[in-house]
Amino acid sequence: MMWATLVTLVSIVLLVVGRYRLIQNVSTFLVASFTLVTLINLFYLQALPEWRISWAELAEGLSFHIPEGKGLYVALAAFGIIGVGATELIQYPYWCLEKGYAKWTGPRDDSPEWEARAKGWIRVLRWDAWCSMIVYTFATLGFYLLGAAILGRTGLNPGGDQMIRTLGQMYVPVFGEAAEIIFLFGAFAVLYSTFFVATASHARVCADALRVFGVTSGDEKIYRWWVRMFCICLPLLFLASYAFFKAPEQLVFAGGFMGALILPMLGVAALYFRYRCCDARLAPSKLWDIGLWISVAGLFVAGGYAIYTKIV
């Protein structure tokens, strides 16, 4: 509890005084470091016959087989939080605004200069989306394969107070006695960066929600004040949940499950903006529209099935 309190207090200070660049640089360094260690671990694991992942096992994993029992619930929960989940899709525009991209594009008008700036910004978004997809797909595959190779074969189930220690077993075959230290660093990197960025993002969403619902005015100074207040209150709320709720993996699954339910709503919002709010000069091609509809359909399948399995 002492360490949790210390981390909370340090985070509050960093979040209150920090800006986009600090949050971006810290989180990028932490996550990239541990992801690289994990991929190196997976690579060297293939040299150990008892832990090597075969092509047959990969083919079985890619087969169209729906797991029974809690396996499907876990898969749907993971769908809601891995890669770019519901919360990231909601929070992404706030970081774009804080970075200043929208200010560079400027208010919409009929000039060809504005059209050129807007199209340039959309190209940046597309590159960002494609590069992000490549990065998080390979990173996610690395963690999935590592978990299947070690935890799946040994029957270890991370949960309760031993969750971090159990997950650390994935690094023992390659790193030996140093695995615990390496994973402690990695766990801190990933978990703290998630805590750090999520808190900063939720603070901005909550502060903006107060403006949307008319609780506060649209004044930028008032908005910034509320962002700082939420940067103080949210970490304290998280600390309280840690103190009184002793099953962290259940919170992770519950959050992922709710994220899977929110994804269809975001799909509808995307369709609304595409067909009701999009400037005709910036309309995407038919191929992009087809991709959008396929994505929305996939979000509805995942979200609908999540609701069905929970109710039935």
Pin down the residues of each PLM region.
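Membrane-interface loop-to-helix entry segments
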Residues: 6, 10, 14-45, 256-263, ...
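C-terminal membrane-solvent junction of multi-pass transporters and transport-like membrane proteins
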Residues: 26-29, 208, 214, 218-229, ...
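Hydrophobic alpha-helical segments and their helix-loop junctions in multi-pass secondary transporters
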Residues: 32-70, 75-78, 82-94, 267-279, ...
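Helix-loop-helix connectors at the membrane interface of multi-pass transporters/channels
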Residues: 1-2, 97-103, 109-110, 199-226
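Selective recognition of specific alpha-helical transmembrane segments in multi-pass small-molecule
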Residues: 84, 114-151
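Loop-to-transmembrane helix boundary motifs in multi-pass membrane proteins
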Residues: 1-5, 178, 210-244, 292
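Extracellular/periplasmic helix-exit of transmembrane alpha-helices
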Residues: 96-97, 102-104, 134-165
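Membrane-helix boundary/coupling elements in multi-pass transport proteins
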Residues: 81-89, 140-143, 180-211
